[in-house]
Amino acid sequence: MLEYRAGTYDVVVVGAGHAGCEAGLAAARMGCRTLVLTLNMDNVALMPCNPAVGGPAKGHLVREVDALGGEIGLNTDRASIQMRLLNTGKGPAVHALRAQADKRYYQLCMKKVLECQPGLDLKQALVEKIMVEKGKVRGVLTSTGARFEAGAVVLTTGTYLKGRIIIGDLSFPGGPNGQFPSVTLSDCLADLGIKLGRFKTGTPARVDRNSIDFSKMSIQPGDKKTHNFSFISEIKEREQLPCWLTYTTEETHRIIRENLHRAPLYTGVIKSQGPRYCPSIETKVVRFSDKPAHQVFIEPEGRNTTEMYVQGMSTSLPEDVQLAMLRTLPGLERVEMMRPGYAIEYDYVVATQLKPSLETKAIPGLFTAGQINGTSGYEEAAAQGIMAGINAALYVKNREPFILNRSEAYIGVLIDDLVTKEIDEPYRMLTSRAEYRLLLRQDNADLRLTEKGYKIGLVSPERYAKYERKKKLVEEERQRLEKTMVAVGDEVKRVLEAANSPGLPQQGISLAGLLRRPEIGYEHLLQIPGNHPDLPDEVREQVEIQIKYEGYIKKQQAQVEKFRRLEEKKIPQDIDYGRVRGLSVEAREKLEMIRPASIGQASRIAGVTPADVSVLLIYLERARREGRKEN
């Protein structure tokens, strides 16, 4: 094959899924000449699985990407066909927005954003090789011989690396939705010394809306109130489409059990580990054999298609078995299957080989983001993508990397878990993974991150000005509520009684004091006579949360200060752990392999005990005093 020089860029992004789109846009918006390469121009921002964005923890990630200046939130708002705020009966830490998206319109909108982004080129090509010279990345080589030179390369290849599609006893090379896999790039990474693993994921069948009897299902409408993921979206209303709820039956389970001998998960055809929190229907039936039924949601894939997504029935069973079990569900007795479900096995990069910036430790200038790092989900991919794009841009500008820690963002939790812990299954973000989740709420992502996005050049001056106005309104209103005292007259008594808030104050009380009562919301304060400013709902929500949960927030902030002290104790990257006496054998091996950046990160490595951390602290302090190189 004859090679030719096809172009020179600051940053080349390989892959245009949810990670690749964010990485490319971030690098270009930070002033880098950027190239995004995709296997198929018609599959930019493809949603090969669930046509949905958000949910617990995942919605938090979307809000954080948006606050930094990313695109997934805005694009979801454009393409949404239904939105719901989940967990409203619980505390604000776990409130989460979830949207159904028109998957085709989502792709078209995101593709247009990339095409219109100054400094970004979008091209179709199959990348076969990462070019490395003198230990540093120098660009990529495509299957047609095109050589694109670059100062940094971001790999966002999703599940395409040596992808293998499995349906029953049928198995063939392929990517999601019948696309081509990437084979030689996986071999190239292995040749470069990058350790790879192998995971599995899957998707359910798509069925024809015209063959469904919805009268036998429960309707799941969107919220009447209009929600948006992006803090700068101006969409005031949208026409929504409902989802539908049905259940598996004993007959469903019987068909599955009688065909386990044809299930690749149980015949040994699939050997790799799948996602724990999104198991196949055959796994659910086997694992929870005492459960008579499982929820199944029927979700529209878009406004201009009859395809419906069967959420909760991911499977790799043969096609005939899939159709038979689908027809045992209420409402699906005569259903027609438009696409079968399938499993896909793929190579991934063991993420402990990455720095917190998502740059590979072995090859400077090479970054990885998304499912190639062993994660699952569009949101996790987008979060890694924007961070990899930011850090690739900073790398070519010889600037310090941009790192978010666990106390600052769910993004920080996600990346720290990936680069610190040895994951053995596709990683999914959960609210339970965040120690400081009361501080990392979806409602305050802009207050946490927009200023950071502005400083690195991702957030526009116009957006930053809007953020500052909101921040000022929140501070002013909070001060007003703290300072405004009201007498406990008939009006206040009437409001408290109507809200079933017991125990009347014996004397005057501030509006903030009233708001701290569990039964009292901001809407109750508006019923008390006085001058109430006309404020946006998002400002009122923020003020109410800050006041009502003030004690808990302060307690968590104190915990964060302890965390930060450990994070600030840096460990030199060239430290010789062989010289650190007193470490256990396992701890020394793990520390040598992962090479944590701080004492805090070291303490989170499996196999590193508190005693090992103490030994390391003593060693570093002694080295500092003696003025050794490890200082």
Swiss-Prot record:
Membrane-traversing stretches: none
Binding-site list for FAD: G15, A16, G17, H18, A19, G20, V127, S182, Q371
Ion transport as UniProt keyword: no
UniProt KW keywords: Cytoplasm, FAD, Flavoprotein, NAD, tRNA processing
Record bears the keyword tRNA processing: yes
Recorded superkingdom: Bacteria
Binding locations of NAD(+): 274-288
Subcellular location: Cytoplasm
One of the GO biological process terms: tRNA wobble uridine modification
Pfam families in the record: GIDA, GIDA_C_1st, SAM_GIDA_C
InterPro entries for this protein: FAD/NAD-bd_sf, GIDA_C_N, MnmG, MnmG-rel, MnmG-rel_CS, MnmG_C, MnmG_C_subdom, MnmG_C_subdom_sf
GO cellular component term, pick one: cytosol
Cofactor(s) the record lists: FAD
Quaternary organization: Homodimer. Heterotetramer of two MnmE and two MnmG subunits.
Function: NAD-binding protein involved in the addition of a carboxymethylaminomethyl (cmnm) group at the wobble position (U34) of certain tRNAs, forming tRNA-cmnm(5)s(2)U34.
Descriptive protein name: tRNA uridine 5-carboxymethylaminomethyl modification enzyme MnmG
